[in-house]
Amino acid sequence: MEIQVVGMERLDDFMGLMETTGQRDGFNIRPKSYFERMLDSLGEKVRLYMAFYEGQPISGAITTNFGGKTCYVYGASDNAHRNVMPNYLIQWEMIRWAIETSCWVYDFQGVSGILEESHHMYGLYRFKRGFNGTLDELAGEFDYIYQPLKAKMVDQAIALNGAMRTVKRKLQHKN
């Protein structure tokens, strides 16, 4: 397995991994244009890491580095070759970058907040917790709703989409 710091030339590979991860874990992903803007605007303060196994991209992650803090902001992996655990090696390389740039904090960012093994996002918590960090609970996000009817419709559409992804994921696992 090989880990590389790559640029825009590998963004399509990363997006494919994001789509696979989103389908597997039941979450929506941001559009490619979002990641293009992130990589373009943050310059030297952002890195896209990719893991390759037998020449194929099997995992990717985006990390930012600013003000003494390195943040793991996005990660994705293929369904194939999960047994070689590329996400751990990518994390190690990102932690090395944090050390090289004299960061004093490596932030894995958030987890769902529901820390029950039965929750579908528990694996993300287990992965991050495996690095022996601490879980810091912050205030979170606040939204001001200025068009309640439209907001309710969007919330219902998102919930329906999530439910459909869950059903699809369960059907795929049965086959």
PLM regions and their residue ranges:
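A conserved beta-strand-loop-helix scaffold within acyl/acetyltransferase catalytic domains
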Residues: 1-83
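Secondary-structure transition/hinge residues
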Residues: 22, 26, 99-102, 136
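Solvent-exposed, flexible loop/coil residues
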Residues: 31-33, 52, 85-88, 93, ...
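A generic structural-conservation signal
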Residues: 5, 31, 107, 137-138
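Active-site/acyl-donor-binding loops of N-acyltransferases
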Residues: 108-175
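A short, terminal or domain-edge coil/loop segment
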Residues: 54-65, 83-86, 101-104, 156-171
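Acyl-donor binding region in acyl/amide transferases
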Residues: 65-133
